[in-house]
Amino acid sequence: MEGIRLIAAHLPMLYAGSEDAEAWDAVTWASTIGGMVIHTAGVTLPHGMEHPASGIRNIVHGKGLAALTPVITDASYSAAPERYQTIAKLLGGSSTAGCGDAIRRFLERIGLSVKLSEQGITAADIPWLTENCFKVSKASIANHPLQTDRKTVARLYEEAL
């Protein structure tokens, strides 16, 4: 959670053009923490769903995550309300149900308010994306607090269009 706190506090000012060295240090440290967390705990459904999307349309990984994460968070908050409550608060939100909205507001502040459709994904791609998600991202799916099936993943892709 420290990485999220640091990113929320410092990345918007850097995106706006600040050259503040302490902010750069904080964002760099947050990135390091993120890498250690991924190495130790793995990733969850947003990454699992993003990899097929970036594979089919050569989407930049961060943009794919930006399109998918708020939608997946909205669907997942009931599976880990305390965790999502903490994330929402770190991003300036106040309620568990509002975590997806807090993520959306943060993404807007850093110019990453995107949809999969803006990245070239269409509704016709969803069956392929869904099947490939389950082929290549089983660990990410299993690691996510909300257990999902193909129908749920397809719906989440559709909502992210």
Regions found by a protein language model. Give the residues of each.
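C-terminal charged capping/lid subdomain of soluble metabolic enzymes
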Residues: G92-L161
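Active-site segments that bind and position negatively charged phosphate/pyrophosphate groups
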Residues: M1-A102
